[in-house]
Amino acid sequence: MAIQWFSSSDNDPERYELLRRSFELGWIAEDTRPSMPDAATVKTKWNNDEAIMLPDILADVIDRYSTDLEQSHKLMERTLNGEEIAPKIEAEPYASRLNPKFPLLSAVFEEHDEQCIEKLFFDAEENGEVIGEDLWCKASWLSFDDNDASMRFRFSFGMEGYEDVAADPERQMLASELTDAIFPESAAITEHPELNKLLAEMVGAKPAYTERIIYFNAPNGGAQMHHDVERGHLGVVFAQMSGSTGWLAMAKPVLIDEIQAFLELPESEAALAKVLPDIDSQNALRELAEDRAALSCHMDEFDHELSEALMDRCPEFIKHLFDRGYGYILKPGDVLLMPQRDLETCVWHTVFCTSEDPGEALSFALRRID
C-alpha cells in the first residue's frame, strides 16, 4: 500500500494531517514513492478513466522557475493581506510581460460572488487591433471558512458560468497566454518536452492547455470531492510547484462502488451517525445508495449534502478510500492527470493541504489540437 491512513500523528514527522475547514480527517504517510509509469500504462489508465500520477516529471525544471514562484507567492501573500491586485499587475515584473498585448482595462469586486476577491479584465491586442475581448483573471477564496486561506487565480473569458468557452478556442488560447504573462511558471507544463510528448501519445494529438487555474492551497484548506467536466475538455493536468497536497481520486463509478461497499460495513452505522446525526438523513443516504442511478444523480446536484457528508467529513470513509488505494501525495515536480470524459465516467477528486505553508499548483484543462 503506497499511502497509509492513521487516526493520529503519534508524533511521526512523516505523517501529514488531513485537516480541512476544521474537520479532522486523519493522517497519512507514504510508504514508498510511486515509480514513473511508461507511456503504454499512462494511455491505458487514461482510457480507463483512472487518475495517473507522474512522480517528479517536472523536477528537472522547478529550479528554473524559482524566481517566478517566489514572485507569485508574494502576490498571494499581499492578496491575503488585503492589498488590491490590480496595482501589482500594473507594476513590474508584470507590466513588461503584459504590455502591449494584454492591456488591463478594469478591476471589479463582484458583490454577487462572496468568494470573489478581485476580477481583472483585459483585451488582447495585436498591431493596435483588438483580437480578443473580455479576457479575465479572477482571484477567489476556495471556501467561506475564515480559517481557510486557500485561494485561486482563474483565467477565462466572457460571461462566467454562461459562456460556452469550448466554442471559442481562439479566445481560450488568448486567456492561456494571459496566464503565461502573469504566472510564467506555467511553462513548466506547457514547454516541458517529456510531459508534452507523453500527453500527445496519450490523447493522440498535440495537447493544448486551457481554462487555467493557479491554486494556493493553504493549511486547513483544499477542495471537497468534485469533478471538473466541461465540454470540449478531455481532463485536467495538475502540477505541484511548491508545498504539498494529499489527494483521493477515482472515477465516479468506482466512487459509487466504494460508497455502496462502505455502507455495507457494520462500522458504517456509527461513522455515519457522526456526520449525519439525523436518522432520517442516514436512511435517505442508504436508500440512495441502493440505486446507483439515483445516487449518481444526487451527486451531480448542487446541494448533495447527504453524499457530501460522507465523502468530505467522515474520517472512516476517507480511511476506506485510502485503504483501497485511491490516495496520492503530491510534492514539487509531481503531476496528476485526471480524465474528465463525461459526467458518468469522470474522475472525482478531493484535495488537502499537507504542507505547513500555502503551496502553489497549476491546474490546466487538457484539450486536443487536431
Describe each region flagged by the PLM:
Residues 1-337, 341-370:
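N-terminal accessory scaffold of Fe(II)-dependent oxygenases
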